[in-house]
């Protein structure tokens, strides 16, 4: 019986020594919060700020579809945007800006 108690005590000591979690593993900030916040999410990606990127952006702005231009115009006008929430952007653009082109 005495040998059994000694073996159980020895097993508990071995288990405590091997299963102990050190503080070094908790020092990392990723341990508590592994996700990046929105401000740091794209911080490690380089922006393409060269002349080619600027030209491509200007080409994209110049070649917008008419529906996209109408939607942007409608988004800038508060009443049109509110109307668009209920009836859609094409109907809102026609309601507020469609008659102006015919004059």
Curated annotation (Swiss-Prot):
<feature type="modified residue" description="4-carboxyglutamate">
    <location>
        <position position="72"/>
    </location>
</feature>
<keyword id="KW-0217">Developmental protein</keyword>
<feature type="modified residue" description="Phosphoserine">
    <location>
        <position position="25"/>
    </location>
</feature>
<comment type="similarity">
    <text>Belongs to the osteocalcin/matrix Gla protein family.</text>
</comment>
<keyword id="KW-0221">Differentiation</keyword>
<dbReference type="InterPro" id="IPR027118">
    <property type="entry name" value="MGP"/>
</dbReference>
<dbReference type="GO" id="GO:0005509">
    <property type="term" value="F:calcium ion binding"/>
</dbReference>
<keyword id="KW-0892">Osteogenesis</keyword>
<keyword id="KW-1015">Disulfide bond</keyword>
<keyword id="KW-0301">Gamma-carboxyglutamic acid</keyword>
<feature type="modified residue" description="4-carboxyglutamate">
    <location>
        <position position="61"/>
    </location>
</feature>
<dbReference type="GO" id="GO:0005576">
    <property type="term" value="C:extracellular region"/>
</dbReference>
<keyword id="KW-0964">Secreted</keyword>
<feature type="disulfide bond">
    <location>
        <begin position="74"/>
        <end position="80"/>
    </location>
</feature>
<dbReference type="InterPro" id="IPR035972">
    <property type="entry name" value="GLA-like_dom_SF"/>
</dbReference>
<dbReference type="GO" id="GO:0001503">
    <property type="term" value="P:ossification"/>
</dbReference>
<comment type="function">
    <text>Associates with the organic matrix of bone and cartilage. Thought to act as an inhibitor of bone formation.</text>
</comment>
<feature type="modified residue" description="Phosphoserine">
    <location>
        <position position="28"/>
    </location>
</feature>
<feature type="modified residue" description="Phosphoserine">
    <location>
        <position position="22"/>
    </location>
</feature>
<keyword id="KW-0891">Chondrogenesis</keyword>
<dbReference type="GO" id="GO:0051216">
    <property type="term" value="P:cartilage development"/>
</dbReference>
<dbReference type="GO" id="GO:0031012">
    <property type="term" value="C:extracellular matrix"/>
</dbReference>
<feature type="modified residue" description="4-carboxyglutamate">
    <location>
        <position position="57"/>
    </location>
</feature>
<feature type="modified residue" description="4-carboxyglutamate">
    <location>
        <position position="21"/>
    </location>
</feature>
<keyword id="KW-0597">Phosphoprotein</keyword>
<keyword id="KW-0732">Signal</keyword>
<protein>
    <recommendedName>
        <fullName>Matrix Gla protein</fullName>
    </recommendedName>
</protein>
<dbReference type="GO" id="GO:0030154">
    <property type="term" value="P:cell differentiation"/>
</dbReference>
<feature type="domain" description="Gla">
    <location>
        <begin position="52"/>
        <end position="98"/>
    </location>
</feature>
<feature type="signal peptide">
    <location>
        <begin position="1"/>
        <end position="19"/>
    </location>
</feature>
<feature type="modified residue" description="4-carboxyglutamate">
    <location>
        <position position="68"/>
    </location>
</feature>
<dbReference type="InterPro" id="IPR000294">
    <property type="entry name" value="GLA_domain"/>
</dbReference>
